């Protein structure tokens, strides 16, 4: 992101990273997890609700993107880099069996950047987390993006290192109240 080191460095080429992102978007679309802020496609957001299952067949576009854009050696290197960071917030919450809303993708096309669409997109996820009474979580690989998420109300939950320069920042936004389930139990 703007010259910052990040997970893009784990990919052998920018085209492999682009293929991965396209595969992820196709998977999100097939699972009904892709949302937009408006008619013009000002911002796109992919999030997974607690308990939402990923259909097996929908993983094929992502797998095809990975295997089609990298050699076996490059795939092994990519897997090695990705495993260095250790368990993130998502894995910790899974282990503790705590529900959460996971934001896997947030994209604001260049013509719409700096116009508040990132906030609008995130507010969709925050509102859904609020409605369900669960935290919204995401991870990002650039310090400047992390700072934007912090400005939008998220909290830094942890940092993972991938090699000498690359990091992943785990962020969380807790709901203001316990949601529908919390209200029923009172």
What kind of region is each of these model predictions?
Residues 30-48:
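Conserved beta-hairpin
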Residues 104-113, 137-147, 163-164, 174:
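Conserved beta-strand-loop-alpha-helix junction that forms the acyl-donor binding cleft
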Residues 1-15:
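Helix-loop element at the rim of GNAT/NAT acetyltransferase active sites that forms part
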Residues 119, 131-133, 142-159, 163:
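Conserved active-site alpha-helix within GNAT-family acetyltransferase domains
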Residues 100-101, 128-141:
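Conserved GNAT acetyl-CoA-binding A-motif
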Residues 11-33:
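Active-site rim helix/loop that mediates acceptor-substrate recognition in acyltransferases
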Residues 108, 114-127:
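Conserved acetyl-CoA-binding loop-helix of GNAT-fold acetyltransferases
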Residues 44-107:
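Conserved acyl-donor/pantetheine-binding loop and adjacent beta-alpha core of acyl/acetyltransferases
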């Amino acid at each position: 992101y703007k010259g910052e080191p990040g997970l893009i460095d784990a990919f052998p080429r920018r085209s492999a990273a682009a293929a991965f992102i396209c595969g992820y978007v196709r998977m999100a679309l097939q699972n009904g997890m892709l949302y937009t802020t408006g008619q013009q496609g000002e911002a796109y957001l992919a999030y997974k609700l607690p308990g939402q299952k990923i259909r097996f067949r929908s993983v094929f576009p992502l797998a095809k993107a990975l295997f089609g854009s990298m050699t076996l050696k490059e795939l092994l290197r990519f897997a090695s880099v990705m495993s260095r960071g250790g368990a993130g917030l998502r894995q910790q919450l899974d282990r503790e069996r705590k529900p959460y809303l996971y934001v896997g993708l947030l994209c604001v096309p260049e013509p719409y950047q700096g116009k508040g669409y990132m906030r609008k997109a995130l507010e969709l996820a925050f509102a859904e987390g609020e409605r369900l009474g669960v935290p919204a979580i995401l991870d990002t690989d650039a310090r400047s993006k992390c700072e934007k998420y912090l400005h939008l109300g998220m909290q830094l939950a942890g940092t993972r290192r991938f090699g000498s320069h690359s990091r992943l920042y785990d962020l969380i936004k807790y709901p203001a109240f316990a949601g529908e389930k919390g209200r029923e139990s009172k």
